[in-house]
Every structure is written in C-alpha cells, then in structure tokens.
C-alpha cells in the first residue's frame, strides 16, 4: 500500500511520466532557440561590414581609411600598392569571449576577401539527367574548409602564394577544358605533393592537358571525403607550412603529357594515392568559364577512345607518329579513328572559342614587342610573321604532332607571361590609369603568383622543355620547323629572364647550350653543313604565300644565346660556354639585307636600335675572349706591351649619341687606362728621375680619367631618362586598343611602328632616347655595375692630381687648365652619385664588396690587394728607386696608388663586374 504525501498548497500533483514528457519538450524548445541564435550569429558574422572598425590588416597598420570593394574583394589601399588585403588579425575587444560561430564566420569572411585565396562561388545549374557535366568545384575539395588551411602569417616583405590543393581525380567529361588556351603557368601551382601517409583513395590518375589541371570528382566520392576530413586536416596543414626552398633542386616536374610522358613520370602517375594537384586562382576562374561555356554551348559528353592511346604512350615514352592509312586491314586503323575523333572534337587553341584568352595572350605579346623587342630581340622575327607561326591550323599535321605543337606553344606562352608579368611596374598612385592591377583582377593575381613563385615557374617550364626534347629530336623530320623555332625561342626567353633579373647562377644556361649543341645548331655556321642532314631544318615551309628561311632564324637564335652567355661571363667572370667565332654575324644575319620576309623589325628606327645593341653584345664577346686572365703564363713584358686590337670595332660618327656607343667607348678607354697605370709601376724609378716624363704621364692619365667620368655621367643620365627601374611602365607607352582581330587583313602596328612609320623615308633613322622611353634592356644591369666599379676606383684620381699640381707649383704650362678640367670632373662625380642613388634597384644584386680580394693579403692601411696582382706578383714587381729625393717621396706614393688602381681595374675586367670594390 503506497502512502501519498499530502498536498499542502492545494495544487494537483502531476503524473511523473507526464513531467518527463514536458521536460523533453522544453529541451527541444531551448535547442531550437539556441540554434536560431547561432544562425543569427553566423549571419551577423558573414554580413558585409559597413564601418571602418573592420579595416584590413594593411590599412590598420598604416592607419588609413579602408575602402573595401565587395566586387573585387580587395580594398582600394591594398590594390594601389599591390599588397595582399587580408583580415588575419582578430580585433581584441573588451567583454566576454565571442561565440564560436562568430569566430568561424570572421575567418570565413577573411578568406572570401583574400584576392590570392580567391575561389569563385559555385552555383547549381539545370542539368539533363542524361548528361554528366562537371560538378561544382566546392565538392572537389578533400578538406573541411579552405579557411582552415591558412597557416602562415604573411608579411609584406615575403608573401607566399596560398595554394589550394585538390585530389587528383579522373576526368569524365568536358572536352572544352582539354582544349583550353590558358597558359601552362596555371599548372605551376600543381607542383604540390601531400604526405604519402595520408592513404587517400584516388579515383584515377590525373590528366594534365595544355597546362590546365582539371579536377573532376564522382558524386559518390563526396561522402567518403567528408568522412576523411578529420584525419586529413592535420597533415595537410603541416605540409602547407613548409615553403619552397629552391625550385631548381626540386624533383621531377609536375608537367606530364599524354604524348611524351617519361617512364619515371608515368610510373609515378600510375601509383594511386601518391599525387595531389592544386589550382591557382587563375585556373579556378578559367575552369568556371569553361563550365559556363560548356553548359551554354551544349557540348555532348562523349567517351572517346583515349584509354588505349594513353596506355600505349605510358608504356612507350618515345612514340612514333602514326600516319593515316586508307588500308582497312592496317592494325592501327581503329586507334587512328579514335584519335581523329578526339582531335576534331577539341576546340582550337587560338580560335573563337577561347576569344578572351587569345586576346589576353596577344596583349602580352604586344607588350613584349613594344617594351622588350626594341632593345634585344629574344624572338628574332617581326610580330606579324611570328603571329602566323602560332596559328595551330597548318596543313599536313597529324594528331600526335599537333598535340606536341600545342604543348610547345603553351610552354612559350608561359615563359613570355613570366617575362612580362614580372617586369610590369605597379603604380603606387591612384592617378595611374593603365596599371596592370586595374586592368583585370585576374591578371593582377597572376602577376603576384609569378613574382612570388619566380624560380619555380622558370624551373618547371624548362623541365617541361627538357621532357619534350627526346620526342622532338626523334620526330624532327615530321615536326614543322616553325614549332622547333618556337621551342628554341622559349629556351632563349627563359635565359633572358634570369639574366635580366640579375641571377648569378648558370644552372639554366649550361643545359640550354647543351640542347642547342645536341641539335647541332653550330653546324649551321660551318661551310660543310650540307654534307649531313640537319636536325633543325626541314624543307622551307610556307607561311601564307611567302617562304621563310629557317636556317637564318636558327642562326639568329644561336647568336642570341652566345650574347647571353657573354653577359653572364662579363658579369660573373666565368668562362664562356660558346667559343665559336661568328665573325660579323650581326650585320650578316640581323640586318634588313636578309630579306623582307624574315626581317627582325619592320620599323627602321627600332631596327637601328636593335642592331646597335646586338653589336654591343658582339663587342663585349670580343672583350671577354681577350681577357688577360686566360694568359697567366705569358711573360711579364708581353702583359703590358700587347695591346688588344679593337680596329674592327671602331666607333663610327654619331655613335656617341646612344648609350651602346658610349659604353663601348668606355670599355676601350678603360683598357687603355689599365695599361698606362700598370706601366707606371714598371718604370716608376725612370718617371721619378725625370720630371718631364712624370708630368706627361700625369697629363695623359688626367685627361683619360676626365673623359671616362664624362662618359659614365652620360650613360647613367641616359639610363635614368629612359627607364630608371628597367621595368614595363604601361603609362609611358599607350597600348593599342585591339590586340586580336580574327580574319583581319590589316596588320596591327605597335606604337613604335606607328610613330616611326612616317620617318622611314627620311635620311635620319637614328634611334634617340625619346624613342626608348619606358623600354626594358638586358644591358642596363651590366652597364650600371661596370660604371659603379669604374667610378669607385678612378674617383679619387682627380683630387689626387689637383693636390699634386698645387703642391709642386708651376711644373709646366697649362696647369690652370688642367686643374679646371679636373674640377669639372669632380662636379660630374657629384651628379653621378645622385644618379646612382636613383638607380639603387640595380645594386640589390651586388656581391659582397670584398669578395674578390684575399682576406690575408691586406696592407697596413686595411685595403685589400688585387687578385690579378697576386697572380702576377713574381712577374711584374716594381723595381726600387735609388737616390730618390725627399720631395719625390710623395710622388712615389701617388704613382704606387695609381698602379694599385690599375690592378683593381684589371680585376673588374677579368673577374666580372657584378660586385663593388674598395679603394
């Protein structure tokens, strides 16, 4: 019998089961209320900010107003200075800690507004049940969120590109992306490998076509990826935290092709769970455009017979081209049919399908011809002829050869984009209307990527060229000469980029010379070239209705490589890799005498400047080959009596008006000054015994030094007026409005051609500094380094001579005139110092000042002795003067100091000019 407790308050007691049900219902209500609060908090976090309190990190650090643009995802301040607009810093406010949902929303908001971490939004499109198009890009990610992978804190000094890796998955459709015309540089970000211990199941091997990595994932793999998110997040963050150390020491290139996959790369690509790929911001945007185009154009999703072909190429990397055969009993008929079907289904590379990308590339090509070609023709052919070479629609080209052609053209596009994007000047003022960042946000992001991954892009592009080389050599007889010309032009462009940037390593120059020698390019200059077949030459091919002499074009490329080798030897003091004597090759192969079809530049003024710069490279080649350091065992009397013959490089009338002629004259006078200063040390006692001899020697040295200072001042002034930063300034030259016009018979003219077209009939076709405003020259860095070294060494000579003349009194007639000339030289030295401060970016690549001097060989004054003097120490020791008067003791010290300057000038000539010197 149960006893009930009396109810003292007169309220009925409910059943305990009913109480339990009520408590459960209250819990559901509380849970729904809390969920609504969380949703409200997350909506509040993702809401666009309206106040200046949510400024980005850069604007907060500079204490300026942050004008954020929701369309571009970048504030106005960061866009003008070219910095990364990011919201990493979490504002510390008073009060209780924020909820977890708001913090996540802030991170998500910061990642969405990050221009380098740009991810286009995915939408759902109406799709037919029978067609399987590309799924959304958001489902291709194998991690929980992109914002959770942002590990390092990026500073303005060293910004690393935030790479978004994706799973390597099997492509199932969209032939439009296979025919993409986007640059191969979008694949450079794919050189990213996750940890092998992740054991991520891969749905197939990756397929890289035309430089675009296409991640497509099956619908059923999404759920499995969600289950693996927790186990993958930690190792992914650890891998992303390690930056690239040296891309030249990296392993194999990520570039793999269906047509020339090497055995090592093939075995690596066939292993499941080993490779991972990622997309750059530009490739993500390109894929989204391809999706939209494929959906609107209605491309059918057809499965082509690519499995048999890919297996065949995977097993045999050095494939043979298969010709079409009309015999139905031929065993390769079915494979040919499938290849032909796929080739017909692919969109054209430069056709109307990718009109935007084609226009963008021709814009880059136009920038090259306007700003680079006029000083050094890396592409030794005029713009109209080279544009015809890029057209993939050429007759008698089979499918396999067409695929190789497309890969080579993509490599060239990548190299040219790296050259242009890395040299474009970013304006820091809002007045600029042609800044690259204002032209297109996508181009701005691509430029930042190329700058931050400069060495990696160069290394990957050159590695892809090396991968193509065996196939190109084996099928040289069927591959068109125009494609081989583009292939070797790409090698020249890559070396040009490194030398222009001041790189001090020859890791790319040596293999490049080896590739040219492997194709026997040097035999083009030999008289018995017709006795054996040439790998580079086929029969002359028609370009339109005209015939191009590709032998002349390949000779030009080899001469350009020789000049690039000369510049490296001139700067670094290393031996030349090409020692072939070309004779007067510039006038023979680059002038308009070769014919109108293969002329380097049609504008007479631009062609004149090109020939001048190339002749300067030819003179520096002769200058380098006649170094005294290569004749260490020569007797000491021949060291000073032998005079280098520069008769064939005599300066013509009017050559001093241009920078190339001034620099050539400066090098000649430098050699004369070295010989005079070293002769002083040899006959020191004879000079001191006769005052007349001493006065004559001082007069000659003073005049020579003053003329050299005047030349240096003119060279630096011309460089400052032309382009002080040696970068592309889009405001200095207007670009044409249209870069790409299909089926247009009218030729597009560059600004240089349009300006100078009326001057063709005039007698004076000389190129002036005004015509070179804003152009980029590869000779500027060696010029500035050489001028800096010369001024650092000969700068004290005018002051020393003035003090000598004043102390000795009227030793000869015309002392006052000499002192006035030396005083004028001192004023020019002050102007030169100001010009060097303007040209400070050129000196950032300088070596350590004391690199070329032996540390142990120091004098009592702390000055380092010359390397060349140490080499010839036993051969050219100065004899001691006997019975020297006390008044001549100071003169002896001065002459000895001049001799030391001569030795250090010889160091500059013999050991390279890329470092500075102490007096």
UniProtKB/Swiss-Prot annotation:
Subcellular location: Nucleus
Source domain of life: Eukaryota
Molecular function, one GO term: zinc ion binding
Compositionally biased spans, kind Polar residues: 23-36, 318-338
Pfam families noted in UniProt: Zn_clus
Alphabetical list of SMART domains matching this protein: GAL4
Ranges where the record places region Disordered: 1-54, 297-338
SUPFAM superfamilies in the record: Zn2/Cys6 DNA-binding domain
Signal sequence residues: none
Keyword annotations of the record: DNA-binding, Metal-binding, Nucleus, Transcription, Transcription regulation, Zinc
Ranges of biased composition (kind: Basic and acidic residues): 37-46, 304-317
GO CC aspect terms: nucleus
UniProt subunit comment: Binds DNA in a sequence-specific manner.
Family listed: Belongs to the EDS1/RGT1 family.
Entry protein name: Transcriptional regulatory protein EDS1
Natural source organism: Saccharomyces cerevisiae (strain ATCC 204508 / S288c) (Baker's yeast)
């Amino acid at each position: 019998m149960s006893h009930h407790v009396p109810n003292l308050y007169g309220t009925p007691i409910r059943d305990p089961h009913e109480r339990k049900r009520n408590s459960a219902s209250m819990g559901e209500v509380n849970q729904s209320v809390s969920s609504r609060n969380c949703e409200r908090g997350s909506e509040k976090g993702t809401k666009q900010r309206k106040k200046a309190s949510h400024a980005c990190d850069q604007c907060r650090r500079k204490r300026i107003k942050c004008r954020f643009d929701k369309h571009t995802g970048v504030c106005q301040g960061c866009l003008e200075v070219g910095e990364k607009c990011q919201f990493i810093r979490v504002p510390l406010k008073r009060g209780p800690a924020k909820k977890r949902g708001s913090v996540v929303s802030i991170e998500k908001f910061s990642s969405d507004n990050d221009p380098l971490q740009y991810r286009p939004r995915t939408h759902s499109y109406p799709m037919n049940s029978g067609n399987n198009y590309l799924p959304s890009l958001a489902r291709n990610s194998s991690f929980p969120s992109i914002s959770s992978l942002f590990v390092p804190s990026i500073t303005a000094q060293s910004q690393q590109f935030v790479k978004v890796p994706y799973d390597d998955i099997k492509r199932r459709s969209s032939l439009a992306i296979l025919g993409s015309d986007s640059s191969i540089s979008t694949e450079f970000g794919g050189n990213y490998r996750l940890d092998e211990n992740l054991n991520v199941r891969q749905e197939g091997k990756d397929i890289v076509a035309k430089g675009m990595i296409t991640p497509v994932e099956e619908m059923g793999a999404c759920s499995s990826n969600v289950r693996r998110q927790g186990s993958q997040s930690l190792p992914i963050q650890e891998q992303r935290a390690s930056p690239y150390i040296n891309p030249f020491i990296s392993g194999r290139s990520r570039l793999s092709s269906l047509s020339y996959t090497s055995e090592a790369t093939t075995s690596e690509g066939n292993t499941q769970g080993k490779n991972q790929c990622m997309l750059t911001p530009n490739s993500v945007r390109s894929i989204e455009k391809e999706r939209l185009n494929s959906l609107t154009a209605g491309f059918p999703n057809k499965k082509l017979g690519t499995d048999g072909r890919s297996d065949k190429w995977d097993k045999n990397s050095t494939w043979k081209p298969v010709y079409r055969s009309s015999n139905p009993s031929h065993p390769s008929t079915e494979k040919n049919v499938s290849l032909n079907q796929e080739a017909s289904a692919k969109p054209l590379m430069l056709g109307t399908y990718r009109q935007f990308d084609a226009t963008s590339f021709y814009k880059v090509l136009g920038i090259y011809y306007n700003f680079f070609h006029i000083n050094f023709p890396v592409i030794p052919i005029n713009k109209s002829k080279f544009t015809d070479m890029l057209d993939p629609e050429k007759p008698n080209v089979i499918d396999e050869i067409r695929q190789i052609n497309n890969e080579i053209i993509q490599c060239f596009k990548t190299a040219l984009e790296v050259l242009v994007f890395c040299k474009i000047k970013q304006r820091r003022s809002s007045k600029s209307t042609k800044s690259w960042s204002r032209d297109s946000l996508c181009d701005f992001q691509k430029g930042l990527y190329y700058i931050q991954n400069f060495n990696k892009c160069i290394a990957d592009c050159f590695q892809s060229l090396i991968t193509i080389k065996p196939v190109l050599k084996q099928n040289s007889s069927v591959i068109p000469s125009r494609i081989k010309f583009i292939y070797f032009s790409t090698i020249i462009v890559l070396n040009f980029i490194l030398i222009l940037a001041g790189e001090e390593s020859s890791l790319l120059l040596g293999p490049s010379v080896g590739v040219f020698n492997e194709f026997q390019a040097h035999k083009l200059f030999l008289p018995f070239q017709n006795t054996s077949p040439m790998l580079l030459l086929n029969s002359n091919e028609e370009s339109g209705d005209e015939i191009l002499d590709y032998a002349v074009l390949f000779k030009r490329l080899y001469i350009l490589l020789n000049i690039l080798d000369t510049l490296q030897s001139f700067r670094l003091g290393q031996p030349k890799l090409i020692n072939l004597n070309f004779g007067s090759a510039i006038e023979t192969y680059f002038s308009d005498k070769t014919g109108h079809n293969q002329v380097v530049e049609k504008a007479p003024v631009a062609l004149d400047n090109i020939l001048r710069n190339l002749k300067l490279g030819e003179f520096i080649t002769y200058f380098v080959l006649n170094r005294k350091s290569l004749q260490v065992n020569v007797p000491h009397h021949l060291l000073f009596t032998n005079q280098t013959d520069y008769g064939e490089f005599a300066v013509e009338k009017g050559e001093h008006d241009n920078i190339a002629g001034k620099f050539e004259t400066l090098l000649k006078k430098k050699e004369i000054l070295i010989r005079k200063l070293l002769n002083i040390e040899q006959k020191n006692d004879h000079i001191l015994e006769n005052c007349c001899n001493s006065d004559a020697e001082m007069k000659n040295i003073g005049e020579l030094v003053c003329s050299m200072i005047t030349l240096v001042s003119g060279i630096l002034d011309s460089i400052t007026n032309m382009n002080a930063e040696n970068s592309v300034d889009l405001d200095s030259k207007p670009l044409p409005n249209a870069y790409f016009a299909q089926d247009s018979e009218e030729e597009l003219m560059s600004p240089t051609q349009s300006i100078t077209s009326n001057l063709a009939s005039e007698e004076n076709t000389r190129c002036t500094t005004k015509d070179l405003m804003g152009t980029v020259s590869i000779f500027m860095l060696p010029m500035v380094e050489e001028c800096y070294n010369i001024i650092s060494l000969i700068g004290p000579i005018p002051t020393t001579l003035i003090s000598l003349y004043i102390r000795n009194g009227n030793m000869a007639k015309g002392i006052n005139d000499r002192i006035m000339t030396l005083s004028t030289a001192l004023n020019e030295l002050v102007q030169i110092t100001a010009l060097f401060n303007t040209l400070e970016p050129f000196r950032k690549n300088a070596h350590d000042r004391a690199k070329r001097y032996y540390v142990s060989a120091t004098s009592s004054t702390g000055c380092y002795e010359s390397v060349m003097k140490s080499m010839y120490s036993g051969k050219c020791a100065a004899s001691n003067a006997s019975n020297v008067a006390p008044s001549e003791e100071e003169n002896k010290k001065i002459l000895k100091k001049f001799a030391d300057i001569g030795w250090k000038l010889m160091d500059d000539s013999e050991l390279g000019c890329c470092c500075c010197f102490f007096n």
